[in-house]
């Protein structure tokens, strides 16, 4: 109020305006205070109602707890009576269990004695087990030796297959050389259709020498690397190309058959060697079946026997014999049997 009284106004109107603003300010403050008072009164009434409701709930809960306390006291008295009865029964049961315990101790002593006997028997079994393990290691060592020998036999079989593939490769080379020779002969063909007998004999000798080139045998380590496997498609293509060539002379056919016969004799010697090795391995380990080696050898042997027995009867073999003569393939000859490298042996025969 002192600050308000110390204000100096220039005119009465300014003082009136000032006091009006002050009056409005205090009026709004009083209205806000009255509103807060009303809100406080309403909140206090609500809080008082809530407290009364909580008081009623607590009083009801107190009554419930009092009745529950009385019930629990009665239950406690009943439990005490049951406890006394159970205590007497447990005392009788403990006495009987003590008797059972004494009997159980006697049984335990007997079982400990039996366990000692079992330990002695276990020691004997362990000694027998060690002896069995030693014998088993010896047997495994012999079995590994037999497996190594089987691997050697399989490598020999692979060598045999490589020999057959080398025969096919030589025939392919002969076909290529024959085609080159035919091209050269066409280029150098004389004007006259009738050549001299010396020129014909020279061409025949050249064809015989070029048709089947000699293939020296290489060691096993070099032979596996030098021989290349032909796919069924290339093998079939080479057969189809070879049927359209010019026929060889009898000398060339005889030399080719001689080379093929030498290869077959070598293959037969290799098979006999493999058979002897198989018998030796079978004697060393009779309980282990040599499925892979024996199956291959039996399959090869049966194939050779069938080819030897059917060499003169089937139309397929007639067509293959004409293949050695570099003639044309008959139209009724099926080509299905010659789509894989296993058909090389049929071509050899």
UniProtKB/Swiss-Prot annotation:
Post-translational note: Phosphorylated in mitosis.
Subcellular location as annotated: Cytoplasm, Cytoskeleton; Cytoplasm, Cytoskeleton, Microtubule organizing center, Centrosome; Cytoplasm, Cytoskeleton, Spindle; Chromosome, Centromere, Kinetochore
Chain coiled-coil ranges: 23-189
Pfam families: NUDE_C
A cellular component term, taken from the record's GO annotations: spindle pole centrosome
MF GO annotations: microtubule binding
Keyword tags: Cell cycle, Cell division, Centromere, Chromosome, Coiled coil, Cytoplasm, Cytoplasmic vesicle, Cytoskeleton, Kinetochore, Membrane, Microtubule, Mitosis, Phosphoprotein
A single GO BP: centrosome duplication
Primary location group: cytoplasm
Annotated spans, Disordered: 182-201
Superkingdom of origin: Eukaryota
Function: Required for centrosome duplication and formation and function of the mitotic spindle.
Family, per entry: Belongs to the nudE family.
Subunit structure: Self-associates. Interacts with pafah1b1.
Protein name: Nuclear distribution protein nudE homolog 1
Organism: Xenopus tropicalis (Western clawed frog)
Phylogenetic placement of the source organism: Eukaryota, Metazoa, Chordata, Craniata, Vertebrata
